């Protein structure tokens, strides 16, 4: 698989094969600028490579139109973006429940588990925040960076997507918040059986994963299959 930003000659991902099994939890490490976020964006269908194959939950993203990729991502992928990508004028609850507005599958999963989408969102948020800390009706623009990161995490987990993609999901969290997030993440993985791709510079939780993949190896790989 070949990919370059703005058709530059410096290819971020190049030649080989990467396969992640269903239910596997993979910790991806690498130096800054090694292409970790780019790889996650390719796997998540945010960008497409100039050449190669990216097969996710039975779909070759390279063969799908943009709207088709959006549909697969909405139904099957929970993405914790490095920049969070929250909608600032929506409330905390509205941001967390947003995936269930775009995906009937995730909406049905949330309702089956918790009785309603709101109850599912409240459960996730109460695992990440001290109960009663503040109203979840506040807009996300009122939150600190660390608080926003927790909202982004809850949004990715709601509705039990088959694949969780986490790009530096604890970078802005203090120790207690980081431990609360990791506890919730692995509880949700145990419940849903989701596959996890997790990028971080922090090796503290590396031992929790089935496998550690280094970008120095991944950069020699061409096909991605999950």
Positions of PLM-derived features:
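Conserved catalytic motifs of ABC-family nucleotide-binding domains
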Residues: 160
